[in-house]
Design a protein with these regions (language model features):
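Residue-level "contact hotspot" at macromolecular interaction interfaces
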Residues: 5, 60-63, 245, 266, ...
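Short, conserved secondary-structure segments in the cores of folded domains
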Residues: 2, 57-58, 242, 263, ...
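FNR/FR-type flavoprotein reductase catalytic core
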Residues: 50-234, 245
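Local cysteine-cluster metal-coordination motifs and their immediate loop/turn environment
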Residues: 261-285, 289, 299-305
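N-terminal pre-ligand scaffold of iron-sulfur
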Residues: 222-265
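Ferredoxin-reductase
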Residues: 1-67, 122-124, 150-153
């Protein structure tokens, strides 16, 4: 049985347990789709994060032969010729480089007919995941050009500072182009004003699911009086009624996972909507910048856990 084909930039959701807790995490496919068809394998990118239970568990426990449950390739962060320009400016950091690595591999393989300029911002050279691989791919094809930007140190043939409107305009191609941005929540926050200042049509700016982290309590609109509180949530699933604690600084999904409840999650960012649930009573905080619910869902009280 052949593995499912995927588009460069997509991920696969992997389900695994840690004790009684049940997790589903999206892992980016970081290779050309050719590998899944000729080599019958997927390559995923996992970064070990400090104070992160899931990545620490994976690095300590997963090994060759470990059996995992995975869903099909998913996600919308890929080139769509009916929507996107062939000239693409990618913006990323060390949290979001993997989708662009898959795209660059596909460009080098001749599977993806685009011109990709990647603006890659990091603090230091040692933080730049895939840097050597990106440079090697750029030597194989003229259609891929990586630009590295380091804020904390000066590196030969690299930019120094931060990703700004001036820097983007310096490397952006002439004529129309699309902007693809994927990375940490900090990257979105820092670069959004500069992208907005470029006055691109909305359809030409694409955001990946990225790593929104656990800092949503610091976003505009979060009610100050709710900080540090713990709530008792009542959940109805498969005709069963369950009660579980949920902190104000965590998502409903995190609370469900901790109790081992399968919420049918996939993207872990509120993009795909597979974790839809109906809010029967109470209030939830949904950051406007990350709210990707359909109008019909909003009208009928549907939330993404």
């Amino acid at each position: 049985v052949k593995l499912a084909y995927f588009r460069p930039g997509q991920y696969i959701p992997i389900k695994f347990k840690i004790g009684s807790a049940l997790f589903v995490r999206p892992f980016t496919l970081c290779a050309s789709p050719t590998l899944s068809q000729t080599g019958d394998e997927y390559l995923i990118h996992i970064k070990k994060m400090p104070f992160d239970t899931e990545s620490a568990y994976i690095f300590d426990n997963w090994e060759k032969g470990t059996r995992l449950s995975s869903g099909a390739p998913d996600g919308t962060f890929y080139y769509q010729p009916l929507r996107d320009e062939k000239n693409i400016v990618g913006i990323t950091d060390d949290f979001g480089a993997a989708p662009f690595y898959a795209m660059a591999c596909a460009v080098a393989d001749g599977l993806l007919d685009i011109e990709l300029t990647l603006i890659y911002g990091c603090r230091k050279k040692n933080d730049a995941v895939f840097m050597d691989e990106f440079i090697a791919l750029s030597q194989k094809t003229e259609k891929f050009k990586p630009i590295f930007v380091f804020s904390d140190e000066k590196i030969d043939k690299c930019e120094r500072g931060f990703i700004t409107k001036a820097l983007l305009e310096k490397y952006a191609p002439a004529g129309k182009f699309s902007v693809f941005i994927n990375g940490s929540s900090g990257l979105y926050t820092r670069t959004a004003p500069h992208i907005s200042a470029m006055r691109l049509e909305k359809k030409y700016v694409r955001f990946g699911s990225g790593d929104f982290g656990k800092d949503f309590v610091f976003l505009n609109g979060f009610p100050e009086k709710e900080r540090g509180k713990i709530y008792l949530c009542k959940v109805i699933k498969d005709k069963k009624i369950m009660s579980l604690p949920c902190r104000s600084d965590e998502t409903l999904l995190a609370a469900l996972e901790r109790e081992g409840i399968d919420a049918n999650a996939c993207c872990n960012s509120g993009e795909c909507g597979k974790c839809r649930a109906k809010l029967l009573k109470g209030n939830v905080f949904i950051p406007k910048v990350y709210d990707r619910r359909r109008r019909a869902d909003i009208a009928h009280g549907i939330i993404y856990t």
